[in-house]
């Protein structure tokens, strides 16, 4: 199972994506990742654990860019 969230707008995408993934986390996840687009580059950060754990480890919410996608997975 997985949850996917996307954002495109004027604000920084990463904090919005992290917040959205946290709101869907009640299911319990094994891994999470975020990709954003900034200056014609796609930037990716990911890790194993709950959203807050991965965010603390790799600073998901600090990725630059105002377009992005977030994904969380539970491995069954």
Give residue ranges: language-model regions.
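Extreme N-terminus nucleophile/cap motif
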Residues: 1-49
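Structured interaction and signal-relay segments at domain junctions
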Residues: 40-66
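Conserved small/polar residues in nucleotide/adenosyl-binding loops
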Residues: 74-76
